[in-house]
C-alpha cells in the first residue's frame, strides 16, 4: 500500500503540490463505504484479488479550498480494473 502512496506523492511532487497532499490516498470499501484497508504511508497490507479500493489523492490549499478526484478500482488476479469513468483533465471537467 505504501508503494501506491509513493507513486501518488511523486506525481504531486512533480506538480509542486506535495505539501498540499495532507490526507491518506484511499481505502477499501464493500459493505461499508470506509473499510479497514487504507492506502497510505506505512500501510503494508497487500492488496488481494477481489478487493475494491478508492484512489483519491486530495490537494488542499489553506484559505482557498481543495479537491479530491476519486477512482474506484477493483483488484484483479492480473492487476486492476478502474471502475469509474469520470473526466480528470481540467478542460473535460469544466466542460462537463
Predicted features along the sequence, with ranges:
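Active-site neighborhoods and metal-handling regions in enzymes and metal-associated proteins
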Residues: 1-96
Amino acid at each position: 500500500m505504501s508503494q501506491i502512496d509513493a507513486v501518488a506523492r511523486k506525481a504531486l511532487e512533480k506538480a509542486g503540490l506535495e505539501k498540499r497532499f495532507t490526507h491518506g490516498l484511499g481505502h477499501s470499501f464493500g459493505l461499508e463505504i470506509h473499510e479497514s484497508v487504507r492506502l497510505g504511508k506505512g500501510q503494508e497490507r497487500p492488496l488481494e484479488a477481489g478487493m475494491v479500493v478508492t484512489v483519491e489523492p486530495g490537494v488542499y490549499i489553506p484559505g482557498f479550498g481543495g479537491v479530491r478526484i476519486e477512482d474506484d478500482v477493483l483488484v484483479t488476479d492480473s492487476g486492476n480494473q478502474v471502475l469509474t469513468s469520470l473526466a480528470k483533465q481540467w478542460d473535460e471537467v469544466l466542460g462537463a
